[in-house]
A protein has these predicted regions:
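Amphipathic alpha-helical hairpins
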Residues: 2-191
Length: 191
Protein backbone atom coordinates (compact mmCIF):
# COMPACT_ATOMS: atom_id res chain seq x y z
CA UNK A 1 0.00 0.00 0.00
CA UNK A 2 1.40 3.39 -1.00
CA UNK A 3 1.31 6.18 1.55
CA UNK A 4 3.11 8.92 -0.33
CA UNK A 5 2.96 10.26 -3.84
CA UNK A 6 6.15 11.12 -5.66
CA UNK A 7 6.42 14.69 -6.83
CA UNK A 8 6.62 13.53 -10.46
CA UNK A 9 3.36 11.59 -10.37
CA UNK A 10 0.32 13.11 -12.04
CA UNK A 11 -2.77 13.24 -9.87
CA UNK A 12 -6.11 14.02 -11.40
CA UNK A 13 -7.25 17.39 -10.09
CA UNK A 14 -3.97 18.18 -8.30
CA UNK A 15 -2.50 21.63 -8.76
CA UNK A 16 0.86 21.95 -10.42
CA UNK A 17 3.40 23.24 -7.89
CA UNK A 18 5.30 26.44 -8.60
CA UNK A 19 8.97 26.09 -9.41
CA UNK A 20 9.87 27.53 -5.99
CA UNK A 21 7.46 25.22 -4.14
CA UNK A 22 8.23 23.90 -0.67
CA UNK A 23 9.69 20.41 -0.86
CA UNK A 24 10.05 19.67 2.82
CA UNK A 25 9.28 20.76 6.35
CA UNK A 26 12.24 23.16 6.44
CA UNK A 27 10.87 24.95 3.36
CA UNK A 28 7.45 25.22 5.02
CA UNK A 29 9.13 26.53 8.19
CA UNK A 30 11.08 29.17 6.28
CA UNK A 31 8.02 30.23 4.26
CA UNK A 32 6.00 30.50 7.47
CA UNK A 33 8.68 32.67 9.07
CA UNK A 34 8.62 35.02 6.08
CA UNK A 35 4.82 35.16 6.21
CA UNK A 36 4.56 36.01 9.92
CA UNK A 37 7.50 38.43 9.65
CA UNK A 38 5.52 40.39 7.05
CA UNK A 39 2.46 40.25 9.29
CA UNK A 40 4.27 41.55 12.37
CA UNK A 41 5.92 44.36 10.41
CA UNK A 42 2.57 45.43 8.96
CA UNK A 43 0.99 45.31 12.42
CA UNK A 44 3.56 47.82 13.68
CA UNK A 45 2.18 50.17 11.02
CA UNK A 46 -1.56 49.45 11.46
CA UNK A 47 -1.87 49.26 15.26
CA UNK A 48 -1.32 53.03 15.68
CA UNK A 49 -4.49 53.62 13.63
CA UNK A 50 -6.42 51.29 15.94
CA UNK A 51 -5.02 53.17 18.96
CA UNK A 52 -6.13 56.46 17.42
CA UNK A 53 -9.65 55.12 16.82
CA UNK A 54 -10.18 53.40 20.17
CA UNK A 55 -11.95 55.39 22.88
CA UNK A 56 -11.75 53.22 26.00
CA UNK A 57 -8.52 53.81 27.97
CA UNK A 58 -8.19 50.09 28.76
CA UNK A 59 -8.39 49.21 25.05
CA UNK A 60 -6.02 52.02 24.08
CA UNK A 61 -3.46 50.75 26.60
CA UNK A 62 -3.86 47.16 25.38
CA UNK A 63 -3.34 48.21 21.76
CA UNK A 64 -0.24 50.24 22.70
CA UNK A 65 1.11 47.21 24.54
CA UNK A 66 0.42 45.06 21.48
CA UNK A 67 2.35 47.54 19.34
CA UNK A 68 5.39 47.22 21.62
CA UNK A 69 5.04 43.43 21.61
CA UNK A 70 4.84 43.34 17.80
CA UNK A 71 8.10 45.29 17.63
CA UNK A 72 9.67 42.73 19.99
CA UNK A 73 8.25 39.90 17.89
CA UNK A 74 9.87 41.37 14.77
CA UNK A 75 13.21 41.32 16.63
CA UNK A 76 12.69 37.71 17.72
CA UNK A 77 11.88 36.65 14.18
CA UNK A 78 15.04 38.40 12.96
CA UNK A 79 17.03 36.37 15.52
CA UNK A 80 15.42 33.17 14.23
CA UNK A 81 16.27 34.09 10.63
CA UNK A 82 19.88 34.79 11.63
CA UNK A 83 20.16 31.56 13.67
CA UNK A 84 19.09 29.68 10.54
CA UNK A 85 21.54 31.52 8.28
CA UNK A 86 18.77 33.40 6.52
CA UNK A 87 18.37 37.05 5.71
CA UNK A 88 15.19 38.39 7.37
CA UNK A 89 12.74 38.48 4.48
CA UNK A 90 9.07 39.37 4.50
CA UNK A 91 6.64 37.53 2.24
CA UNK A 92 3.22 39.13 1.84
CA UNK A 93 0.60 37.32 3.88
CA UNK A 94 -2.71 37.39 2.03
CA UNK A 95 -4.61 36.17 5.10
CA UNK A 96 -3.32 38.94 7.36
CA UNK A 97 -3.80 41.52 4.63
CA UNK A 98 -7.46 40.47 4.39
CA UNK A 99 -7.99 40.57 8.15
CA UNK A 100 -6.43 44.04 8.39
CA UNK A 101 -8.43 45.31 5.41
CA UNK A 102 -11.58 44.10 7.16
CA UNK A 103 -10.48 45.85 10.38
CA UNK A 104 -9.92 49.11 8.52
CA UNK A 105 -13.36 48.87 6.92
CA UNK A 106 -14.94 48.18 10.29
CA UNK A 107 -13.34 51.30 11.78
CA UNK A 108 -14.65 53.39 8.87
CA UNK A 109 -18.16 51.94 9.23
CA UNK A 110 -18.63 52.60 12.96
CA UNK A 111 -19.00 55.66 15.13
CA UNK A 112 -16.29 56.47 17.64
CA UNK A 113 -17.18 54.94 20.99
CA UNK A 114 -18.17 51.57 22.40
CA UNK A 115 -19.46 50.14 19.11
CA UNK A 116 -16.19 50.94 17.32
CA UNK A 117 -14.22 49.64 20.31
CA UNK A 118 -16.16 46.35 20.17
CA UNK A 119 -15.37 46.15 16.46
CA UNK A 120 -11.69 46.89 17.02
CA UNK A 121 -11.53 44.13 19.63
CA UNK A 122 -13.27 41.69 17.27
CA UNK A 123 -10.86 42.58 14.47
CA UNK A 124 -7.82 42.40 16.70
CA UNK A 125 -8.91 39.01 18.03
CA UNK A 126 -9.08 37.73 14.44
CA UNK A 127 -5.49 38.93 14.08
CA UNK A 128 -4.50 37.18 17.31
CA UNK A 129 -6.17 33.92 16.32
CA UNK A 130 -4.34 33.92 13.00
CA UNK A 131 -1.08 34.64 14.80
CA UNK A 132 -1.73 31.93 17.40
CA UNK A 133 -2.31 29.40 14.62
CA UNK A 134 0.81 30.50 12.75
CA UNK A 135 3.14 30.67 15.75
CA UNK A 136 1.81 27.33 17.02
CA UNK A 137 2.53 25.70 13.68
CA UNK A 138 5.99 27.28 13.41
CA UNK A 139 6.79 26.17 16.97
CA UNK A 140 5.85 22.58 16.09
CA UNK A 141 7.93 22.75 12.89
CA UNK A 142 10.94 24.14 14.79
CA UNK A 143 10.74 21.37 17.39
CA UNK A 144 10.52 18.70 14.70
CA UNK A 145 13.49 20.23 12.86
CA UNK A 146 15.55 20.32 16.06
CA UNK A 147 15.68 24.12 16.00
CA UNK A 148 15.47 24.47 19.78
CA UNK A 149 16.41 28.17 20.01
CA UNK A 150 13.80 29.03 17.41
CA UNK A 151 11.25 26.79 19.14
CA UNK A 152 11.82 28.59 22.45
CA UNK A 153 11.48 32.05 20.89
CA UNK A 154 8.35 31.00 19.01
CA UNK A 155 6.86 29.50 22.20
CA UNK A 156 7.44 32.80 24.03
CA UNK A 157 5.66 34.71 21.29
CA UNK A 158 2.84 32.16 21.13
CA UNK A 159 2.28 32.51 24.88
CA UNK A 160 2.17 36.31 24.59
CA UNK A 161 -0.36 36.13 21.75
CA UNK A 162 -2.62 33.88 23.83
CA UNK A 163 -2.38 36.25 26.81
CA UNK A 164 -3.22 39.23 24.60
CA UNK A 165 -6.25 37.39 23.21
CA UNK A 166 -7.44 36.68 26.77
CA UNK A 167 -6.89 40.34 27.72
CA UNK A 168 -8.98 41.49 24.76
CA UNK A 169 -11.76 39.09 25.74
CA UNK A 170 -11.64 40.47 29.27
CA UNK A 171 -11.90 44.06 28.08
CA UNK A 172 -14.79 43.21 25.77
CA UNK A 173 -16.74 41.24 28.37
CA UNK A 174 -16.14 43.59 31.30
CA UNK A 175 -17.55 46.75 29.73
CA UNK A 176 -17.32 47.36 26.01
CA UNK A 177 -19.77 44.76 24.72
CA UNK A 178 -22.41 45.90 27.22
CA UNK A 179 -21.87 49.54 26.28
CA UNK A 180 -22.15 48.67 22.59
CA UNK A 181 -25.33 46.73 23.35
CA UNK A 182 -26.77 49.81 25.09
CA UNK A 183 -26.13 51.71 21.86
CA UNK A 184 -28.45 49.17 20.18
CA UNK A 185 -31.18 50.01 22.69
CA UNK A 186 -30.78 53.74 22.11
CA UNK A 187 -30.90 53.23 18.33
CA UNK A 188 -34.08 51.13 18.65
CA UNK A 189 -35.76 53.82 20.76
CA UNK A 190 -34.97 56.48 18.14
CA UNK A 191 -36.25 54.28 15.31
Amino acid sequence: MRTAISKNENIKGAMQAKSNAAHGLRDLFENGLKDIYWSEKVLTKTLPNMVKNASTPELVNSLKSQLNESKEHVSRLEKIFQENGMKPTAKKCDAMEGILKEADGLIKETDLGAVRDAGIIAAEQKVKHYEIATYGTLHAFAKTLGENKAANLLAMTLDEKKKTDATLTGIAMSTINNQAHKADAITNIKA
